[in-house]
């Protein structure tokens, strides 16, 4: 049995508890920590946790604990991670890893110095749809990835600290952009270095200092673009969508709204519908199993399997550090209104090997620009001469 200490009793801690207990059949939360006694006691009762405490040090040094899960507000991550690593515990930390790259790097250094297992809990790269899509893309289904667009929008976070940039590290970018950035990396390839970022962000609705809306583009060394769209101003629920465009294909993913499960109710009697849902009447978009749909189940299954087997999980603290470095560049770009470099101290990926930007040869003299089927059954090919650059087109027999 894997014995887990849960640090944090908020919404994310509850989702984690539901996903962990019972799915592999051998994982148990044996201790929960909260800064408030009432929250700790209530969480323990709700999830069948035998012990609770308000003492962080006691929670992470408990000899009956194997794995520590950090599900605390962002400004508390570093202290919890460093104490758990010093105690020799495996550490899993929620997103974002740090409030900025410097904080994330200190946490990465702490777990690596201690030699403990570490996992970055980026659940949205573990959704069933995303896992299947990444497998298809890695298998060549869309050719070379050119562009990934990831969107997460909803009416705003569930706790007050999210709106405080000192506690959170920023606004919608650090809250949701971290999801979108890592989703794009999963499709483009985490070995491909992020080079620079351009980003717009502003506070459009809420009386706060943090940005509540942002759109950014990340340019990668391969030429691929990762685009993120995040907002705390979207009404009607939570919108989670991803798109991948490649030289040979396209992927569209819709994870939350309009997924094929819709209910209309003339009465306000539906109760809880789904995370960030704003109504319980009219057209509703329920989710059958939120912990599965949001990736929590597959994430913890993979993480805890990797811990038992002594292997690295799909997402480590290094990934969290890279995400923070990209987010830092986005914030600098908002201020400078220009492209800003992504500053990574120790890049562990590889050099880009796609040096021809995906050019396709038609014959010895021409590059193929486009091929399309005509109404008469033949194909039209549009070509560029390799030597002169001259453009031409011709109708040819369709391939059998």
Outline where the language-model segments fall.
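N-terminal Rossmann-like dinucleotide-binding module
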Residues: 1-47, 389, 394-399
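Hydrophobic residues in well-ordered beta-strands that form the structural core
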Residues: 13, 53, 93, 118-120, ...
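Beta-loop-alpha module in the N-terminal Rossmann-like domain of NAD(P)-dependent dehydrogenases
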Residues: 47-110
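Predominantly a Rossmann-like dinucleotide-binding segment in NAD(P)-dependent oxidoreductases
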Residues: 117, 124-208, 337
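Glycine-rich phosphate/pyrophosphate-binding beta-alpha loops
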Residues: 178, 206, 229-237
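C-terminal glycine/acidic-rich active-site capping loop/insertion
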Residues: 220, 243, 248-315, 340, ...
């Amino acid at each position: 049995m894997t014995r887990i200490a849960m640090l944090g009793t908020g919404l994310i801690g509850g989702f984690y508890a539901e996903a962990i207990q019972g799915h592999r059949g051998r994982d148990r939360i044996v201790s929960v920590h909260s800064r408030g006694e009432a929250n700790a006691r209530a969480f323990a009762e709700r999830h069948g946790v035998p012990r609770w405490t308000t003492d962080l040090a006691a929670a992470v040094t408990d000899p009956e604990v194997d794995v520590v899960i950090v599900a605390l507000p962002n400004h508390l991550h570093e202290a919890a991670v460093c104490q758990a690593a010093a105690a020799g515990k495996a550490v899993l930390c929620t997103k974002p890893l740090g409030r900025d790259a410097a904080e994330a790097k200190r946490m990465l250094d702490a777990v690596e110095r201690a030699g403990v297992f570490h996992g970055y809990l980026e659940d949205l790269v573990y959704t069933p749809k995303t896992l299947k899509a990444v497998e298809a893309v890695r298998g060549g289904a869309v050719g070379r990835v050119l562009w990934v667009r990831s969107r997460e929008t909803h009416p705003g976070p569930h706790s007050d600290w999210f709106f405080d940039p000192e506690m959170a590290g920023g606004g919608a970018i650090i809250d949701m952009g971290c999801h979108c950035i890592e989703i794009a990396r999963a499709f483009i390839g985490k070995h491909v270095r992020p080079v620079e970022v351009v980003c717009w962000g502003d506070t459009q609705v809420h009386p706060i200092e943090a940005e509540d809306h942002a759109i950014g583009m990340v340019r990668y060394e391969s030429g691929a673009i990762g685009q993120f769209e995040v907002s705390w101003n979207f009404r009607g629920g939570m919108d989670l969508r991803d798109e991948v465009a490649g030289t040979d294909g396209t992927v569209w993913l819709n994870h939350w709204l309009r997924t094929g499960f819709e209910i209309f109710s003339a009465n306000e009697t539906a109760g809880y519908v789904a995370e960030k849902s704003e109504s319980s009447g009219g057209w509703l978009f329920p989710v059958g199993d939120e912990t599965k749909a949001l990736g929590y189940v597959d994430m913890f299954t993979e993480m805890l399997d990797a811990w038992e087997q002594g292997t690295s999980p799909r997402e480590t603290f290094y990934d969290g550090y890279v995400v923070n470095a990209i987010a830092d560049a986005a914030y600098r770009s908002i201020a400078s209104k220009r492209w800003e470099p992504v500053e990574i101290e120790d890049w562990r990926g590889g050099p880009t090997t796609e040096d021809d930007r995906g050019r396709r040869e038609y014959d010895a003299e021409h590059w193929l620009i486009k091929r399309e089927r005509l109404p008469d059954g033949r194909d039209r090919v549009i070509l560029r001469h390799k030597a002169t650059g001259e453009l031409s087109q011709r109708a040819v027999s369709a391939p059998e």
